[in-house]
Amino acid sequence: MQEQPVIIIGAGPSGLATAASLNLHSIPYIILEREDCFASLWKKYAYDRLHLHLHKQFCQLPHLPFPHSYPRFISKQQFVSYLDDYVSHFKITPLYCRCVELAVFDEITKEWTVKVRNLGSGEVEEFRGRFLVVASGEATDPYTPELEGLKSFPGDVLHSTQFKNGKAFRDKNVLVVGSGNSGMEIAMDLANHGAKTSIVVRSPVHILSREMVYLGLNLLKYIPLNMVDWLMVMLSKLVYRELSKYGLSRPKEGPFFMKVADGKYPVLDVGTYSKIRSREIQVKFTSFSRNLRIALQFSLLFLSSLVLGTHNYYKSFLMQN
């Protein structure tokens, strides 16, 4: 049993920021991380061309600004370098390979007990503290849908967390399942590398530029959300015109409302839409249930590879009273 006033779960950017803030106030803590490094999503599970979608002023961690030389939209490599400097500067030392299995609050002692599996030794370890900070992210584990025909599909099947770049897919027929930001950017990267790329778009999407979102985030400080949403939709229509020509449609709800209500992000376009318009990326299905049967008929698509941009899911370890 180890005791500290504060237990932080997760050594991603949020966990590191919490640790740095506690360090500055000389508050003892322990930070538990499932992977063998901090910021594993960025270091191990992100595709090469990834850039921060938001302006750097919205993304830097507290107490240490980005270098002045960094561009407005920071690359994956630059962000990882910044996090390396951040951890070194604040002398943050996570406990790695600790998978949290259970966290429970004792109403009598007013303390949290956290049980973790040491992935190195296999032993269960226990930590206790007055405060618990859950910084494990919105989603922690790759979601692979149970699609009929997927197990018998003879080609390559990758989740977006396994995808690095499209070099190996040149001249191959690749279908990307999922039209969030990861799916859209991966489709563009595949097309840039010469793959014959198709993408499944299962629901209406808002397509905005990064500059539109930057404007919207600043306007939200001064005017109501519904007015900002109206402006974002008008700007999107002005720039991207009629989406239905290319198998896409816009939701009825506004982009910022959907983020607040459902946690669904708009697609921040960094070049994918122009490739959809030029037909370099084919929108093959606008209604895609849980069935891959059609997609796997080689007479139709001659697929050689499948990339699942189906996001991640959150696995809870908090015990409910």
Q: Across the structure, where does each feature detected by a protein language model lie?
A:
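Short, flexible, mixed-charge acidic loops at enzyme active sites
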Residues: 47-60, 149-150, 319
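Short, basic/glycine-rich phosphate-binding loops at helix/coil junctions
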Residues: 58-65, 249-255
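Flavin (primarily FAD) cofactor-binding/catalytic cores of flavoenzymes
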Residues: 2-41, 71-321
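Phosphate-coordinating loops and pocket residues in cytosolic domains that bind phosphorylated ligands
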Residues: 44, 63, 171
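A short acidic, helix-capping loop that chelates divalent metal ions and anchors anionic groups
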Residues: 65-71
